[in-house]
Amino acid sequence: LEALIAHEVTKRYSHHLALDRVSLAIPAQTIFGLLGPNGAGKTTLIRIINQIIQADEGTITLFGERLQEKHIGTIGYLPEERGLYKKMRVGDQLIYFAQLKGLSRQEAVARSKAWVTKFEIKDWWNKKVEDLSKGMAQKVQFISTVMHEPRLIILDEPFSGFDPINAQLITKEILELKEKGCTIIFSTHRMETVEDLCDHIALIDKSKKILEGSKRQVKETYRTHTYTVEHRGAFDLDAAKYRLIQQRVVEDDFYKSVIAVNDNSGPNQLLRDLIPVTEVHSFIEKIPTMSEIFITLVKGGHHE
């Protein structure tokens, strides 16, 4: 089941095509990475989903229904440009945002108190937002995004301003929300976060979607069939089958080699060919990182 389907969504501004027939299918209860360089169109798509702006063409379906005003309460949105009221106290702010999303005052107070206890920030309840550090304000904004228990959560660069400890806390919360049944759209340039958290990804570049799929499928598509081998003793391999990209001495007679497979031999055949000629200590496929795939596609200008 898809939580959200975007079909040929297009958005034009006077001198700029911000989205060019972008289609996406976001599976329910997954963490979906919406990736792309600055200015690619990610934020435009997020604003359309949040009904802040409207698409010129195309449709968006949310949990099986065409997107409409009533869905605002089922979405939690953490924008990249954070929007807390500087003069307002933390507790009042959380209660206010929760009520905006349809909670009763009593429920808003109860949930706000539960969340500040969970995040160990009860001492901040009566502090004004302007007195908080950037990281503290981030926590408050995150709570206000998820407190009304939305089915779809959209996080735009959620880790900017967080130190590693708080980033870990937010990561844990995101994974818990997914376990509880939430679908999370994660817009970021931080590829290491994508590597750790996302199940599915889409890459938008120059207003078009250029890649979409599960993380495993994407990595499978961009496999380089290259292997790193640590071994004792130098060797030569059949040049028709293998290309020795690198072989360096680590110490004494101990080497680290990088080998590309030229034909369809695969890892088992490579290992069989290595065993008679060297003493293999470790053997691992070099799987491209999401960062490497991102750079290859964006710099290479590859489009579907």
What do these predicted regions represent?
Residues 1-10, 300-304:
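ABC-family P-loop ATPase nucleotide-binding domain
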Residues 4, 11-205, 211:
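ABC transporter nucleotide-binding domains
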Residues 10, 68, 91, 191, ...:
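Alpha-helix N-cap/helix-start and coil->helix boundary motif
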Residues 70, 221, 293:
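Residues that scaffold the ATP/ADP-binding catalytic core of kinase and kinase-like folds
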Residues 94, 112, 215, 271, ...:
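Generic structural marker for isolated residues within well-ordered, non-membrane alpha-helices
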Residues 171-260:
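ABC transporter nucleotide-binding domain
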Residues 226-300, 304:
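Short, charged/small-residue-rich alpha-helical element at the C-terminal edge
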